[in-house]
A protein has these predicted regions:
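His/Asp/Glu-rich metal-coordinating catalytic cores
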Residues: 52, 63-147
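N-terminal active-site segment of His-dependent metallophosphoesterases
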Residues: 1-70
Length: 147
């Protein structure tokens, strides 16, 4: 049986403008929370020896990504790669696919295009499974992708 983690809406680099009323120490902790959450997800994936992680939209808070976020993700994806854990990313309405995206992820990471795609995965137990998905091209999409 496939063993995986499904997550979404991590919103790395969110400015948390609505939380600016918090004390500086607490506000700093809130700003770190998305990074800590994703690190905890990776830690759990490694501990549970999952086959893959699906990130179903809004990994980033906007289409503009900071170097900090890219370096952090590369480090986390590399930890997963070393244990042969794959990552499938769908971009959401907050972080749509754009020509600005130049990230080069490790070879265990696949990013869905704006068309429905299917990836074939072989689990650690030898089972073949298919993962279907797509990424948002724009911050709003009303197109029915499943027909």
């Amino acid at each position: 049986m496939a063993k995986f983690i499904h997550c979404a809406d991590l919103h790395l680099d969110s400015p948390f403008k609505s939380k600016s009323y918090l004390s500086p120490n607490i506000f700093e902790d809130v700003q770190k929370s998305a990074y800590e959450s994703f690190k905890n997800i990776v830690d759990l994936a490694l501990k549970q020896e999952v086959d893959f992680i699906i990130i179903a939209g809004d990994l980033f808070d906007s289409e503009n990504r900071t170097l900090r976020a890219e370096v952090f993700l590369n480090e986390q994806f590399e930890r997963l790669r070393k244990e042969q854990i794959f990552v499938y990313i769908c971009h959401g309405n907050h972080d749509p696919l754009t020509s600005k995206i130049t990230s080069q992820w490790p070879n265990n990471v696949s990013v869905f295009s704006n068309q429905v795609e299917t990836y074939q995965a072989i689990t650690k137990s030898g089972e073949t499974i298919y993962i279907h998905g797509f990424s948002y091209q724009n911050d709003a999409s009303y197109e029915n992708k499943i027909r």
